[in-house]
Structure formats: C-alpha cells, structure tokens
Amino acid sequence: NTATVYLLGSVHFMRKDIYPLDSKIEDAFKKSNILVVEANINDAAKADIQRLMANAYYPGSDTLDRHVSRETYDLIKKETERLGIPIQMINKQKTWIISLTLSSLELLKLGFTPADGIDMHFLSRAGGKRIIELESVDYQIRLLSSFSDREQELFLLYTLKDIKTIRQEMEQLLHTWKSGDTKGMELLISKGNSGDAQLAPIYEKLIYERNRRMISRIEEFLRTGETYFVVVGAAHLIGDRGIVRALMDKGYSVEQN
C-alpha cells in the first residue's frame, strides 16, 4: 500500500541522440532510492567473465561446424566474410554467442552502443542509490548456454534474417519507445517470432519464464515502504503475458506516464 515501483522498458543498445530523456523519467529516477536492473554489468565479477568464456567456447577440438547444418555454417561464413571476420576466428565459438556478436556488430555500425543503453545510463548515475539485480550476469549466461544445439541454430538463423532489416526495425523501435506506444512496440517485437512456431519455445524461455521471476521480485518490492526504479528490457513489460499486465491482473494499480 505504501511502495511505489517505477517501471521503465530498456533498450539495451541505444544511440546518444536519445538523450536527454523525458523529464518524467528523470524525475521518477530522482524520487527513487533503489535502482533495479536485470544485471549490474558494472559490478560483473571476474568469475562471471570467466564463466562466460567457458560457456561461449567449445572445449578441446570441438568446433562450430559439428553443431550446425552445412547450410547454416555456410550462411555464417558468408556473413562473417561480409564483416571482414575469417570463419576461423569464430569456429570455436558456440552458436548463441555468435548470434549476439553478429547482431551487436550491426547495431554498433548504426551507432547503437551498450554504453548508451538505457540501463547503463542509470547505472552510471546511481550515485548513492542501492542497486538490486533481478537476475545476474551469471544467470543470463547460464540461460543462453542452456539451449540445445538445434535451438541455438534456430535463433542464429533468425538473427541472420533480422540483420537484413535491423536499421528499419531499430528506427521503428526508437519511435515507439520515445512516444510510449506500447501497442506499436508489442507489434514490432512480436513480429519477429510470430511466423515461426519453432521459435516459440525459445521465446518462452527468453521472455516469459523470466517475466514470472521478475514479477515475483517486483511483488516483494511492493510489500515494502521503498520507492524503486526498475529498468528491464522493454519486451518484458508489454503484451498479454508481460509484467505490466500480470501486475494489473493481480490487482495492483498501474499507470503509464
């Protein structure tokens, strides 16, 4: 009855020209004494980085070509050659880290960087605010590496397809984000996986299972007398199975500013 939780959908790769943010957002941040993020990248322990390296590479003599089809391997080779990266440089990398690397490189070329991401913007300005992680770097690494070879390959194929239209999609995402158009953002984000039933189990683990965990934590916050500023990926907030809808269904008062 006494807690306030501000929810802000993050875009993890952002452009500098998005700043300064709307004063309503900054005012909510100033009013909050606790900052909540998915994972505190600034505080990522050395052990987390070592765990990332261990989970991102095939052990021993194992290589990428043993884990994807010949057709997919050729597509990866074509894409890396376009980027000026010899296939030999990534042949030890697992498929999930290649997916993240390829999409990240495209975003960087378009001027979107993780350093300018919404979550990093607030982490860098947390000052004396207490910082709470809804997840952790370690949890996210374990989640991504838990997918089967086939699931990782499907996600990579989706990434290779998505890269072709990433400029247009990011511009649309920026427009919906800045205008607070949750329906437009929902359509944009769901468009990518709606046509492929094989992606549904992946989306279930990447979004909906994590939503349930986050909702449980946010409910804990709402039972305190504190004011929280929660920054999570925008995809977690929107839609019929998103965090906002779940909180409303549970009887909490939710308003969009």
Predicted region positions:
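A cross-kingdom marker for long, charged
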Residues: 201-257
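Structured, acidic catalytic/metal-binding patches in enzyme active sites
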Residues: 1-202, 206
